[in-house]
Amino acid sequence: MIYLGIDLGGTKVSGALFLENNSLLLHETLLLEGREGKEVAGLVTELCKILLSKGEVPENECKCIGVCVPGIAYSKTRTCWCPNIPGWENYPLLDEIAESVPNSTVFVESDRTAYILGEVSLGVAKGCNNAIFIAVGTGIGAGILIDGRVLHGTSDIVGATGWMALKPPYDKEWDMCGCFESHASGTGIAMQAKKELKALLEAGKKGLSYLEKFEIEKITSREVFEAYDLHDSVAIKVIDTAIEMWGMAAANFVSLFNPEVVVFGGGLFGPASRFVDRIYEEASRWAQPISIKQCRFFPSMLPNEAGLYGAGAIAITNYKRDKNEQ
């Protein structure tokens, strides 16, 4: 049996051949370059064939392919929804790969499922049966592993963490992405900084924030972290609020699921990884006391590769599970 892991993102698709112990044999990356709909699926199957060719895998050999997508993989319909890929509202990716790659078994999962499986296979949560991966980037999502199994839910939407209710009363601005995401994702941090800066300037208080040097509508989380490092008052207020919310959200996970480990990753947890100790301190104020003492918080050990290794783990763990259940 040969295992393939495919990590599909919004701008590129990466893939690798894996051994059963999740050791990576070889990998390749192809750029989407504006492709949409069926063209993206074609690129995924092309990558599978490139990997199999480079690995000199015979066509008649059995293959298990794990794919992680930037959206929701619907297990009941075998389709996926990826908002950043035009034409992928209910796209039959699984069936297209299975038809294009002979003798293959294909499993498609959301990226947050891949992240937690990657960390449990090779990262800071290696060997854990109960672990949470909180992915903070443009949005916020979570992969949840309990008693050795990833949770999916009725509609495969488990882990839509951005909608956690953390700050009453309700505000209409949270309609599109939720309360938590509006404050503590990359997009949310930029949005809150813009709001604070506008309020400062409208009050006639100019020259008080480093962020004034930027065009307000072009401010991103990168500029906010840059300002934070310069002890900017606007950035400090926004980042401190995000830290509080990361801690509260983690506390909710700890109290609900009693995990061994909570892992923070995603694009934002390069600059934010230094705050993990503060996040744990905040979580300790809110979480069930016994559970939080048994739990450790870590930044991801696979910041740029969790999806790829997780995709390999999707193939390996699902194949082993199905084999054991036969």
Please place each PLM-identified region on the residue numbering.
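ATP-binding/phosphotransfer module of carbohydrate and carboxylate kinases, centering on a glycine-rich
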Residues: 1-64, 74-77, 97-105, 121-128, ...
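Residue-level structural signal for beta-strand termini and adjacent loop
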Residues: 18, 29-30, 85-86, 156-157
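Conserved NAD(P)H cofactor-binding loop of Rossmann-fold oxidoreductase domains
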Residues: 70
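A charged helix-plus-loop insertion that forms the helical arch/lid used to bind
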Residues: 78-89
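General beta-strand structural signal in soluble alpha/beta enzymes
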Residues: 106-110
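Short acidic loop-to-helix transition motifs that present clustered carboxylates
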Residues: 113-115
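Glycine-rich phosphate-binding loop of actin/hexokinase-like ATP-binding domains
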Residues: 126-184
